[in-house]
């Protein structure tokens, strides 16, 4: 029997998230709900990241997932919905999802902001039918000194990711293997 991850993953993830009480919060947001949440996520980003507003203004575009829920009990997963903005305007909606297996227990929520610094990276992302971090493109998770202006950094990767929770920017978090898929809203 052939294992079909694409069919099994959403079923397992939804069952698990529903069981731990995140099902209704994590999925099926309307375009308006997503845009409102993205606005809030961007405000937090600009507050947490010195020079963040200017950095986003210079970007080719940015993808914001304001609430990503990650939960696990041996089998785990993450899910969130967000919007791609170009020039400050929402152009498309996306979800991010991943699955993991192994020793894990618990749940957490965080936000992800992926900033596209090059046109080619943005084009490749938008033309994909399902984009996987680390496979279809590399995302450098931003690391720099607290209070330092982000615009002083010289990023070599075409996509820079920021992950932050209730207590600010999070270190040691990876989005490698996360699948990002366009939503029809």
Label the model's feature ranges:
Residues 1-12:
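Bacterial N-terminal signal peptides that target proteins for export
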Residues 27-185:
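Small-residue-enriched, tightly packed secondary-structure blocks
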Residues 10-21:
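Bacterial N-terminal signal peptides
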